[in-house]
Amino acid sequence: HHPSSAASDVYKRQILNDINEYLVFVSQVKNLSENTTKSYERDLKKLYLFLEKLNVTNYSDIKEEICSAWIGDLYSQNNKPKSIQRHLSSAKGFFRFLKKNNLISSSPFELVTAPKSSNTLPDVLSPEDVEQLLNFKPSNTIEIRDMAIVELMYSSGLRVSETVNINISDFEENMSFLRVIGKGSKTRLVPMGRFAINAINNWLNEREKISNNTDALFLNLKGSRLSVRSIQLRLKKMAIKQGLPPVHPHMLRHSFATHMLESSGDLRTIQELLGHSSLSTTQIYTKLDYQHLAKIYDKSHPRAKK
């Protein structure tokens, strides 16, 4: 359900208008050179086209994931890290300007970082990187657990805090959906890919050796719920062992969002999957929503392919 084209035209005019006002501001008030102003203009037009491609119709739709996806997009067009840094600072400046003028309440670009030099990866792994990360046979309890964690986080775009809080009772519909309690206690249902389901089943068998008197899905060897810190450390180790730079959990979520966006372009669905929309906990999902989510998911997620 995309907003009416009239509404999105108004938004397009507004964003172009805001960009122009910002350019006037930097050249006249901040007295920046014509060259700098021109490069801001080029960068912001690129951002505008990227947002247009995703059917973004509102500043409030621009979340951190979209900002990262844009950086990833610039990266994939072989822009040099220096140039990406500049694009990012243009965007940050523009959004700070919007915030100062009360057009937005907070800037989605604030926490987004660009690669410092050519040997650091952006915040998004390519599907091939994910493949490489997960390309090993787990040989002990911990590896079986870690495999399940990573497959699940990437499969469903979970935050690391959501991952540690999962209980076995949160699986629905013979394990094809997971009920996730996100920020602000908002509940959402996320589909799981085949790889994740297999990895979790392997872990559930293994988990019985450790404990069967707790509902927490992911445990340490002592039988208590795994901590966020443990997942961060294990993931970093796993990445290095697989010949990748250190990976942090949020990269899996960014990668999920980016890969889904790239292959489906369906921003609304992805916001729902990420738990960004204002779905209230009480909202009853209809079967139809499920089917739409599941359809987009199966078509778009690199590891959902049946």
Map each language-model feature to its residues.
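Single conserved hydrophobic/aromatic residue that forms the stacking wall/gate
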Residues: 1-11
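N-terminal core-binding DNA-recognition domain of tyrosine recombinases/integrases
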Residues: 12, 20-35, 41-121
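Basic, Lys/Arg- and aromatic-enriched nucleic-acid-binding interface segment
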Residues: 104, 132-160, 184-186
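DNA breakage-rejoining catalytic core of tyrosine-based enzymes
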Residues: 117-132, 184-195, 209-214, 228-230
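C-terminal catalytic core of tyrosine-transesterase DNA break-rejoin enzymes
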Residues: 151, 155, 229, 237, ...
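Conserved tyrosine-mediated DNA breakage-rejoining catalytic core shared by Y-recombinases
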Residues: 156, 161, 165-202
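Short, polar N-cap/turn motifs at the start of nucleic acid-interacting alpha helices
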Residues: 171-173, 227, 245-246, 265-286, ...
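Active-site/catalytic core of tyrosine-dependent DNA strand-transfer enzymes
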Residues: 194-244
